[in-house]
A protein has these predicted regions:
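Catalytic cores of large soluble enzymes that bind and process phosphate-bearing ligands
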Residues: 11, 44, 48, 124-128, ...
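Cys/His-rich Zn2+-binding cysteine-cluster or related metal-binding knuckle/ribbon modules and their
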Residues: 11-17, 25, 35-100, 206
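Solvent-exposed alpha-helical segments within well-ordered globular domains of core cellular machineries
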Residues: 17, 21, 35-39, 50, ...
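Long C-terminal interaction/binding lobes of large macromolecular proteins
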Residues: 18, 110, 137-212
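Conserved, well-folded catalytic cores of nucleic-acid-processing
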Residues: 22, 26, 44, 59, ...
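Extended interfacial segments that mediate partner engagement and assembly in macromolecular machines
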Residues: 34, 83-152
Length: 212
């Protein structure tokens, strides 16, 4: 019998519940998975848990968003923004820092990045200003950006975000492109294989002109 399956209907340790509640805040983690993770964590040696606490505390103190691009970094200097060999007139926009590392692994792109705080979602109270689109527009204007590549997830929220960016810049000299159709509908950027992502970026098309 799966004891974890009984958790919602039986009383459990408050400490376990508190830990599970935190795990449930992670993406794609439901109640059962959260309780499994909580019990698994508490099954580790105490020394491992203490070490994890120290690592987490260090991350809380050190990790911050780059003021220029929004990437989560440890140091004061951003390895992307401060690299003067990169194309400084092209900005690739993603909705999560982990997407930057996925794209960097393809070696298909050598420009700058801008990390939004998620995709547009009125239902989840994610507005243009709250996800950072105002800051993106400011960057485009002040730095003379010539191309914005919208690499958002291929779901409704991601596509809506890409179209919104294109609409904001439709009367400017900056073009807005997106990866070619190699990425299937519903695709999540971090799960795309490097070759597919590389080809999609190299073959990028203007937003709104995908089927022409």
């Amino acid at each position: 019998m799966d004891l974890v399956a009984l958790i919602p209907t039986m009383e459990t340790s408050k400490s376990v519940k508190d830990i599970a509640d935190f795990f449930k805040k992670l993406p794609s983690v439901g109640s059962k998975s959260a309780y499994r993770m909580a019990y698994a964590a508490l099954s580790l040696p105490k020394s491992d848990l203490i070490a994890f606490e120290e690592v987490l505390n260090q991350a809380i103190q050190k990790v911050h968003r780059c003021l220029k691009c929004g990437l989560l970094i440890d140091d004061e200097e951003c390895p992307i923004c401060d690299d003067m060999t990169r194309d400084r007139k092209t900005v690739l926009v993603v909705t999560d820092s982990k997407d930057v590392y996925s794209i960097e692994s393809t070696d298909a792109y050598h420009g700058l990045y801008f990390v939004l705080r998620g995709s547009l979602s009125p239902a989840n109270h994610r507005t243009p200003s709250s996800i950072g689109l105002d800051a993106l527009m400011k960057k485009v204007k002040e730095e003379g950006i010539q191309e914005v590549i919208a690499v958002t997830n291929k779901d409704l929220e991601g596509e809506t975000t890409a179209l919104y960016i294109a609409n904001l810049l439709k009367n400017s000299s900056c073009k807005v492109t997106k990866p070619a159709q190699g990425l299937p509908s519903g695709a999540i950027i971090e799960y795309a294989d490097p070759l597919t992502m590389s080809e999609a970026i190299k073959g990028r098309v203007l937003v709104g002109k995908e089927n022409e």
